[in-house]
Amino acid sequence: MNNRLQPAPCIELDGAQGEGGGQILRTALTLSMLTGTPFRIERIRAGRSKPGLMRQHLTAVQAAAEVSGATVEGAEAGSQALAFAPGPIHGGDYRFAIGTAGSCTLVLQTVLPALWFADAPSTVAVSGGTHNRAAPPVDFLIRAWQPLLARMGVTQTLALKRHGFYPAGGGEVLATVTPCAGRLGALHLTERGALRELSGQGIVANVRPGVARRELEALAARVPGVVGSVRELSPAEGPGNALVLDAVHEHVTEVFTGFGERGVPAEQVAHGVASAALRYLHSTAAVDEYLADQLVLPMALAGAGCFTAVTASPHLTTNIAVIEKFLPVHITVQAERDASVVRVQVN
């Protein structure tokens, strides 16, 4: 995908722009690898309570550097400035350890799009957190994100080998990727189709199963039609608790997740999941805000496509701004006549 006949000019980024989080860095790493364009970013996560690079961000940088043979400056804990100059993307067998409960999914979402266009198949194992309230859980990637990528021509599988909850981590995810034969196909996702299933799962590891049962009962009371089940993991994978709701529609599956914490009632966890799900179900949008965040980059790589979403989050608009610095695309976000829906178009 990249063109290295002439040295590409370095792109300058402000890590505090827009939403100001780690997504700016991750998107820049992905697109830098894919386009062969070096970048420099200042003020990384400057507005956060702990600014600069944290362990999961460092792991994403190190993973991108290994996949692309990049030259990197500033890859240190707490650093608020980073320079990244990529080389060619190489497929292979990779293993990355975050060392904390930092998100495996965010590291994977940094390097996987590059490996879609590598010179050989790849496997990527990442250890760390798999169920973390600050990032999409692995369930979301497997059941919401991955099927839509497959429709665009991506051949990729994700397997959850071991759960990793905050704060201990210790989880592992394995991804396998076969490079794409050509450019990604455009995805047009403006309707979600008929509702087929509402499936709730209460996951517990070294936590009483009664907690999951209470969560599911409270969820079913708020969201009619939910069919729930309790999943007990090995105590060694805990302590941890997650409540996961899949809204399976004809054209898309959305995944909503809440996480149990010490001192937080099970009913409160269920209330959060139910509120997010009902906002989506009561709209006519094809996707919720978090899936919208994750779709815009592959759509930009395809060069075309559109989807409707519940809202245009600050994450989404900031991501769009970074994408447009690296790729010759124009991405518009417009409110539909239905005030609960926005339309995102890639041209």
Swiss-Prot record:
ATP binds at residues 109, 290-294. Belongs to the RNA 3'-terminal cyclase family. Type 1 subfamily. Its main location: cytoplasm. Coiled coil: none annotated. One of its GO terms (cellular component) is cytoplasm. Signal peptide: none annotated. One of its GO terms (molecular function) is ATP binding. PANTHER family: RNA 3' TERMINAL PHOSPHATE CYCLASE, RNA 3'-TERMINAL PHOSPHATE CYCLASE. It comes from Ralstonia nicotianae (strain ATCC BAA-1114 / GMI1000) (Ralstonia solanacearum). It holds the Pfam family RTC_insert. Keywords: ATP-binding, Cytoplasm, Ligase, Nucleotide-binding. It is an enzyme of class 6 (ligase). One of its GO terms (biological process) is RNA processing. NCBIfam families: PRK04204.1-2 (NF003246), PRK04204.1-3 (NF003247), RNA_3prim_cycl (TIGR03399). HAMAP family: RTC. It comes from the Bacteria. The gene is rtcA. Its EC number is 6.5.1.4. Catalyzes the conversion of 3'-phosphate to a 2',3'-cyclic phosphodiester at the end of RNA. The mechanism of action of the enzyme occurs in 3 steps: (A) adenylation of the enzyme by ATP; (B) transfer of adenylate to an RNA-N3'P to produce RNA-N3'PP5'A; (C) and attack of the adjacent 2'-hydroxyl on the 3'-phosphorus in the diester linkage to produce the cyclic end product. The biological role of this enzyme is unknown but it is likely to function in some aspects of cellular RNA processing. It catalyses: a 3'-end 3'-phospho-ribonucleotide-RNA + ATP = a 3'-end 2',3'-cyclophospho-ribonucleotide-RNA + AMP + diphosphate. PROSITE patterns: RTC. This is RNA 3'-terminal phosphate cyclase. It is found in: Cytoplasm. The active site is at 315 (tele-amp-histidine intermediate).
